[in-house]
């Protein structure tokens, strides 16, 4: 089990790295073209009761960056924090060359965890409650069945982990992947003895041998990284430059006096 200070300091280190990566991405955005959906803009303008182009650009940039933040944070957890803080073995491209992990049934497995007592657990990491759809749930059930039947020497059990939220909030797809049918009868095998689903606090506790405070320690590391990096001091200026460049690019094509010319914007983007 990892102790509090070990987790906090390690998470802080990788969170600092990630914060600098996000800053670098923002700097790169200044010289890139942001994709804008001209058909969506009138809806956003009306739905959010926006008053001018500046407010619309603020909304577009926030949405654009939020997608990158969410994706980047998922990679931070998956590729940096789990392997480097909690000692999991990430099934990267090199690891997947090793038998039996080169077989297709392991495609949705992200980590191998070898516990202190020698137990081998496989982790399929998911970002949230909506990550799994019906087709994937059925496919996961089939893949997990193959792993448990054909590679019992390589794994003792399988966990599907969701790093935020609660198990009660998950969709029924997380039951289906374990072989539990709710309502409609799907072609799945009961794997409830060997496949578990943990979300939120339960996931972080399971990861760290039952320590209930693990998620607080992870968050503490992130907060300490932010306090030290003070990213807002540079991000504010970069965001202002980004906004100014977007406004300048579209101002003549979207403004028609005091109103917005959506057809001019459509023509600029789509030709």
Which sequence ranges carry the predicted segments?
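Hydrophobic transmembrane alpha-helix bundles
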Residues: 1-21, 66, 132-148, 196-206
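Catalytic centers of nucleases
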Residues: 74-145
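Charged, structured surface patches that assemble and position nucleic-acid processing machinery
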Residues: 173-271
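A short, terminal or domain-edge coil/loop segment
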Residues: 54-55, 60-61, 150-167, 216-225
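Short, structured coil/loop segments at alpha-helix boundaries
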Residues: 1-8, 106, 113-115, 133, ...
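Hydrophobic, Leu/Ile/Phe/Ala-enriched alpha-helical segments that form helix-helix packing faces
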Residues: 15-22, 81, 85-90, 144-151, ...
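Catalytic cores of nucleic-acid endonucleases
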Residues: 127-198
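Interdomain/boundary linker segments immediately adjacent to catalytic/signaling cores
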Residues: 1-77, 264
């Amino acid at each position: 089990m990892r102790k509090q200070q070990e987790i906090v300091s390690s998470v802080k280190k990788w969170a600092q790295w990630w914060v600098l990566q996000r800053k670098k991405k923002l700097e790169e955005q200044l010289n890139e073209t942001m994709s804008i959906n001209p058909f969506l803009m009138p809806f956003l303008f009306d739905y959010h009761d926006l008053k001018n182009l500046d407010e619309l650009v603020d909304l577009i940039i926030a949405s654009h960056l939020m997608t990158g933040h969410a994706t980047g944070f998922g990679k931070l957890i998956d590729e940096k924090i789990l392997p480097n803080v909690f000692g999991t073995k990430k099934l990267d491209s090199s690891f997947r060359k090793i038998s039996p992990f080169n077989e297709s049934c392991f495609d949705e497995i992200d980590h191998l965890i070898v516990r202190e007592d020698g137990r081998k657990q496989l982790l399929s990491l998911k970002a949230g409650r909506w990550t799994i759809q019906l087709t994937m749930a059925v496919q996961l059930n089939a893949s997990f069945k193959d792993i448990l039947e054909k590679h019992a020497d390589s794994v003792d059990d399988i966990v599907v982990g969701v790093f935020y939220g609660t198990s009660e909030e998950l969709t029924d797809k997380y039951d289906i992947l374990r072989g539990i049918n709710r309502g409609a009868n799907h072609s799945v095998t009961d794997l409830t003895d060997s496949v578990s689903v943990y979300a939120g606090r339960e996931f972080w506790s399971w990861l760290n041998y039952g320590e209930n405070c693990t998620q607080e320690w992870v968050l503490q590391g992130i907060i300490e990284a932010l306090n030290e990096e003070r990213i807002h001091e540079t991000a504010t200026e970069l965001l202002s430059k980004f906004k100014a460049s977007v406004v300048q690019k579209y101002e003549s094509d979207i403004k028609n006096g005091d109103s917005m010319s959506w057809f001019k914007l459509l023509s600029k983007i789509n030709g």
